Amino acid sequence: MVVSADPLSSERAEMNILEINQELRSQLAESNQQFRDLKEKFLITQATAYSLANQLKKYKCEEYKDIIDSVLRDELQSMEKLAEKLRQAEELRQYKALVHSQAKELTQLREKLREGRDASRWLNKHLKTLLTPDDPDKSQGQDLREQLAEGHRLAEHLVHKLSPENDEDEDEDEDDKDEEVEKVQESPAPREVQKTEEKEVPQDSLEECAVTCSNSHNPSNSNQPHRSTKITFKEHEVDSALVVESEHPHDEEEEALNIPPENQNDHEEEEGKAPVPPRHHDKSNSYRHREVSFLALDEQKVCSAQDVARDYSNPKWDETSLGFLEKQSDLEEVKGQETVAPRLSRGPLRVDKHEIPQESLDGCCLTPSILPDLTPSYHPYWSTLYSFEDKQVSLALVDKIKKDQEEIEDQSPPCPRLSQELPEVKEQEVPEDSVNEVYLTPSVHHDVSDCHQPYSSTLSSLEDQLACSALDVASPTEAACPQGTWSGDLSHHRSEVQISQAQLEPSTLVPSCLRLQLDQGFHCGNGLAQRGLSSTTCSFSANADSGNQWPFQELVLEPSLGMKNPPQLEDDALEGSASNTQGRQVTGRIRASLVLILKTIRRRLPFSKWRLAFRFAGPHAESAEIPNTAERMQRMIG
């Protein structure tokens, strides 16, 4: 009968095995520790035995000679073994370094072989193309030399790659050869070199001209803000200026370059004198060379003004349109004589009847230019420079006028209404024909800087004329004039213009809008191509009386070259209130004022010979020199 093993006995057996294993492990650890201790003790005893053997050797103990030799022999053997191991390790390290260097050299050789194959392939291909030319022209001249140089470079490159002797100088030689080949490849044919030089010379000359144009002149303090604008010109702007200048006749350019030495000496003497008032400061001689550029443009503008005066004015105004047909021939004569224009005097101009012909004043300009002192050699750049300065100085002038009027209103009480009759002056001072040009040319009484002074006279006179036309339109009581024209009431209009200029707020200076548009229309870079004014709308209001406010008037001025349609007049205040006869009379007066505006603009474009400047009679003015224009206009018309 079989008896089954008890599970408890098996568990006990397993526990016994585990305990035995643990005991054995502990014993093994103890034996290892004992072995380490014994080893340490052996090393210590060996060291002590070695030291004792050395000491005994010193004392020459014959008894312990064998023991001493054995001890020392064992020590020497151990030291030799250690030295051998160290030597082997050093040799192994050297061998490893040598292996690495050889492996690096092998990789470099493989790279050289690959480059040599590529170079030989390119050389073979190049020689095939060289020996079998398709085009006979390519086998001669510069192309053949370039191909031979390329083949020489490839052959040398292959030789240097495959020759191990020149490994050290390989990099330097390759760099030198590559530079030489690049120079050969980049060197164009002689014809191409000449073409490139011809193309580069005009650009360089244009750059030098542009820089010299901005730096060679001797500007005054008033012209300093414009210097930065001229330096920033580009080549295409200078080209445009040259193209515009090339359209002028050659004779005009020759006349503009003729400067008598008298004016130059006068200019040098006047530079050393004390500063003068801004209204009468001297201009440089270079200003005179810009007159010719505008003469052709003036003739066409005068023609447009003549068309307006002929087609849309009554017969009596045709007779009194300031002699456009008679003055055109005088303008051509002035065109040939305007090359040397006298500068403005330092004081008010004294006009003598015997010295100045009556008809010669028709060619006078009443507005000096604002250009800086440029030498005559840079006359072609005038049209480009003027457009930039015109825009900047116009904006600055508007702000200056507003500030001056605000200061006058703050400092002085409201000026009383001026008398409707202007003070009389001696008729011997000014000829009768000169009244046609200067009776609507008052200058601003405010103190403006030298930089803005040339604009003040032009723009203030333009405001006066526009204000006169506004008063003509806005005055229903004067519509039915006994004489049919407004010449009899010129003194009344004159006083109303003065009052309106003295009492208008800065916000009502609407003619400045027209002023900026006219400046941009006449003086912009492409102004010579426009040949006329663009449609300019001028809206303004005038207070003819302190108690009565006239309605807002809008006047549309559309003068242009070859204009065949009559100018449009939009009058919101007269719609349905005025009769047909009164509307025609008002329209005739407005057209006549339009003719005067165009003629005054024509007078102001070139440089002036004389300028008759007089001031408004204000609360602080000591005297007013204003010609009795009403009486003289009546005498001329009557």
Curated annotation (Swiss-Prot):
Further comment: Encoded by one of the numerous copies of NBPF genes clustered in the p36, p12 and q21 region of the chromosome 1.
Segments forming domain Olduvai: 174-261, 326-399, 400-503
Protein family according to the UniProt entry: Belongs to the NBPF family.
Residues that span the membrane, as ranges: none
Subcellular location: Cytoplasm
Span list, region Disordered: 157-285, 563-584
PROSITE patterns in the cross-refs: ODV
GO cellular component, one term: cytoplasm
Domain of life: Eukaryota
Keyword annotations from UniProtKB, A to Z: Coiled coil, Cytoplasm, Repeat
Keyword Cytoplasm listed: yes
Stretches assigned to coiled coil: 10-43, 69-115
Segments of skewed composition (Low complexity): 214-226
Compositionally biased intervals (Basic and acidic residues): 192-202, 232-251, 264-273
Cysteines joined through disulfide linkages: none
Name of the protein described by the UniProt record: NBPF family member NBPF6
Acidic residues: bias regions: 165-179
